């Protein structure tokens, strides 16, 4: 893969591998394995040619008896695993996002923190209290002022002041959660219901659930929600229903 070419990287959680695919044919062109269980989630930074994959542990959210503490760094051009960041004392790393300040923010579920990583040194430079040992996924507001974690079994969303690195509070939802998204205008956080095929729409101005949307013709709960960049559609996937819902 040359510096100016295109490529695709994928995480195989079941096989504990990282795959490099042909973006036209989707054929697997390179495989990197040998990781502890389990490779989880993915952050790609095209500008630097780097990708980051956390090692969560051998369980699932809320039931992870052997949590791990590593974040693996990949060179996209060389298709190589080039470094492993040790996050200890923080454990069970999961969702990670690139902040507006160029730092990486990653939930460390069992430690109830969002760890902050400097990409130049590949070191943990701070840890922010998330208020929950069930903080699984996170999102960052488009203006960079707030970070939100969805705290699965707790049925709450933590609100963090990102510049101050301070937990402001938690928003209660009617039931446990399985995913989170934020609208491109930053006015709405979507929390995905883990018990029913429903979405909770949270007003970021007052921190309250203002509406519930039932996913029609989806028999089981959903997990992942993503807005289109132009705010025109919200896509919601339900793994156990084999469905993708598109919401205007």
Each model region followed by its residue ranges:
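Predominantly soluble domains enriched in secretory-pathway, periplasmic, or organellar proteins
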Residues: 1-248
């Amino acid at each position: 893969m040359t510096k100016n070419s295109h490529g695709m990287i994928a995480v195989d959680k079941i096989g504990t591998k990282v795959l490099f695919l042909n973006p036209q044919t989707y054929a697997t062109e390179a495989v990197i394995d040998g990781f502890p269980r389990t490779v989880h989630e993915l952050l790609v930074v095209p500008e630097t040619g780097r990708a980051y994959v956390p090692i969560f542990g051998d369980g699932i959210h809320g039931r992870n008896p052997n949590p791990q503490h590593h974040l693996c760094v990949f060179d996209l051009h060389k298709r190589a695993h080039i470094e492993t960041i040790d996050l200890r004392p923080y454990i069970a790393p999961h969702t990670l996002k690139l902040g507006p300040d160029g730092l990486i923010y990653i939930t460390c579920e069992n430690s109830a923190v969002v760890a902050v990583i400097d990409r130049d040194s590949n070191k943990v430079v701070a840890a922010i209290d998330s208020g929950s040992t069930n903080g699984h996924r996170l999102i960052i507001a488009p203006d960079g002022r707030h970070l939100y974690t969805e705290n699965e079994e707790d049925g709450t969303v933590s609100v963090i002041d990102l510049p101050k690195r301070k937990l402001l509070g938690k928003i209660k939802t009617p039931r446990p959660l399985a995913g989170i998204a934020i609208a491109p205008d930053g006015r709405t956080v979507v929390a995905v219901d883990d018990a029913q095929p429903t979405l909770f729409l949270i007003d970021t101005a007052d921190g309250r659930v203002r509406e519930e949307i039932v996913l029609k013709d989806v028999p089981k709960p959903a997990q992942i929600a993503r807005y289109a960049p132009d705010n025109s559609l919200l896509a919601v996937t339900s793994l156990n229903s084999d469905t993708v819902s598109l919401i205007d």
